[in-house]
Amino acid sequence: MNRKYTTAQFKGIVDGLREAFDDVAITTDIMVGFPDESDEEFNKTVEFVRNIKFADAHVFQYSQRRGTPAAKRPNQISPDVKEKRSKIIIAETQKTRDEFINRFIGKTMRVLFEQPAKDGLFEGKTDNYITVQIGRAHV
């Protein structure tokens, strides 16, 4: 994918952010199924996700775009494999997201309420991007 950094460099930046900022939320985008992605590479991605413990992630499948260098690469990944890998990464990021959110249960946090939600609730985000819903009586 022509990234200009390694996973070790990325982890170093994440570690520095977590050391500098209490309760920082580290989120990411993760593409699965890029051409030539081997089982070994995918498994390394899963381990990396577990190790970094992202607060949230947008997981998506590579899709071939005509005229791009990646579209011309051999070993395009099958839709079934991309779907399976996507589900695995989503499950892992849901675990780490839940772990992150659960750290704040019972804590008082600042919330910016921006919109009404369903059933008469208000919805907002904390400083570290956790979605919160409360009843009107608490606003």
Model-derived segments and their meaning:
Residues M1-D56, Y62-V81:
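Conserved non-cysteine loop/helix-boundary elements of the Radical SAM core domain that shape
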Residues K72-R136:
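Terminal RNA-binding accessory module
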